[in-house]
Swiss-Prot record:
The keyword Metal-binding applies. This is Phenylalanine--tRNA ligase alpha subunit. Its EC number is 6.1.1.20. CDD domains: PheRS_alpha_core. Its main location: cytoplasm. GO terms for cellular component: cytoplasm. GO terms for molecular function: ATP binding; catalytic activity, acting on a protein; magnesium ion binding; phenylalanine-tRNA ligase activity; transferase activity; tRNA binding. Belongs to the class-II aminoacyl-tRNA synthetase family. Phe-tRNA synthetase alpha subunit type 1 subfamily. It comes from Lactiplantibacillus plantarum (strain ATCC BAA-793 / NCIMB 8826 / WCFS1) (Lactobacillus plantarum). It catalyses: tRNA(Phe) + L-phenylalanine + ATP = L-phenylalanyl-tRNA(Phe) + AMP + diphosphate + H(+). HAMAP family: Phe_tRNA_synth_alpha1. The lineage of its organism: Bacteria, Bacillati, Bacillota, Bacilli, Lactobacillales. It is found in: Cytoplasm.
Length: 348
């Protein structure tokens, strides 16, 4: 058999082996077997030394042609197998877009956040501006500007977290009132602000007390403001949160920064006003405190109490949540038990 015939035989056999190779490993093995240093094509090339000078160039050119043809077939088959592997992987990872999606568990607003948001929406609809005050406050704004002199019992160290002698964690969102009064331009209309936020007291945590809780303070100042305006606002708040079926009453009380002062009660949720242990047989439950802004508070902000008046009210979203949903321990709101909190979530 001539060298050219041997090369043709090796070419045909190699192309057949390449075509039948179904994995890259087999393709690579064909390359080593045919084109390697110890392969048959290399052996044929070594035999060219026995050829005549006239035959040697022809056989050499044909040998290169065979080698190039085999290498091209190897490259082509390798590319086919690599693409097939990619296609197989893509098919395995293919998503059926017609299948229903898997619902991802979502978080939800905390029950107290829901109540705060509900009240913010209510009051913004009435023209109030939402004010976010500082939780770290000056003693001057937290107490003195609210008609709480230095010897007032509420300023005792056991009730307040002091950071320095003159700086503290605010005990009430009422501390936002003085700054609102100072900064408002009454030539542009009445002052109507709502101040929600966290406040701090040196209380021992129990079923009804917490060292950190929430307050919402409302303040309205304008000419010709009366107690009737305050009463109408409080009734609207109570009925929005608790429902129209509950009555609201005002009774006299005392707060240093309002005069006169009142407390608002609503019909007991548990007994519908008949009297029970929860309402201490009165048929009423206290929900918030309020009153007409004290003239001295207005004067300290440079406002003439003879020309302007106003009302203020403060309520606790934590307490509202306890009353509205019948929760008997305020600490339950802060244990982060999703099973407990999820029952209060209102969609939409």
């Amino acid at each position: 058999m001539s060298l050219q015939d041997r090369l043709t035989e090796l070419r045909d056999q190699g192309l057949a082996d390449i075509k039948s190779a179904d994995v890259l490993k087999k393709v690579n093995q064909v390359k080593v077997d045919l084109l390697g240093k110890k392969g048959p094509i290399t052996e044929v090339l070594r035999g060219m030394r026995d050829l005549s000078p006239e035959e040697r160039p022809k056989v050499g050119a044909y040998a290169n042609e065979v080698r190039d043809r085999i290498q091209a077939a190897i490259d082509e088959r390798r590319e086919e197998l690599e693409q097939a592997a990619v296609n197989e992987q893509l098919a395995a990872e293919k998503l059926d877009v017609t299948l229903p999606g898997r619902e991802v568990p979502q978080g939800q607003p905390h029950v107290i956040t829901q109540i705060i948001t509900e009240l913010e929406d209510l009051f913004m609809g009435m023209g109030y501006q939402i004010v976010d005050g500082d939780e770290v406050e000056e003693d001057y704004y937290n107490f003195e500007r609210l008609n709480l002199p230095k010897d007032h019992p509420a300023r005792d160290m056991q009730d307040t977290f002091y950071i320095t002698k003159d700086v503290l964690l605010r005990t009430q969102t009422s501390a936002d009132q003085p700054r609102s009064l100072e900064n408002h331009d009454f030539s542009k209309g009445p002052l109507k602000v709502l101040s929600p936020g966290r406040v701090y007291r040196r209380d021992t945590d129990d079923a009804t007390h917490s060292h950190q809780f929430h307050q919402i303070e409302g303040l309205v100042v304008d000419k010709h403001i009366t107690m009737a305006d305050l009463k109408g606002t409080l009734i609207l708040v109570a009925k929005t949160l608790f429902g129209d079926q509950f009555d609201v009453r005002l009774r006299p009380s005392f707060f240093p920064f309002t005069e006169p002062s009142v407390e608002a009660d609503v019909t007991c949720f548990n007994c519908n006003g008949k009297g029970c242990a929860i309402c201490k047989q009165t048929g009423w439950i206290e929900v918030l405190g309020a009153g007409m802004v004290h003239p001295h508070v207005l004067e300290m902000s440079g406002i003439d109490p003879e020309e302007y008046g106003g009302f203020a009210f403060g309520l606790g979203p934590d307490r509202f949540a306890m009353l509205k949903y019948g929760v008997d321990d305020i600490r339950n709101f802060y244990l982060n038990d999703v099973r407990f909190l999820s029952q209060f979530y209102k969609k939409g």
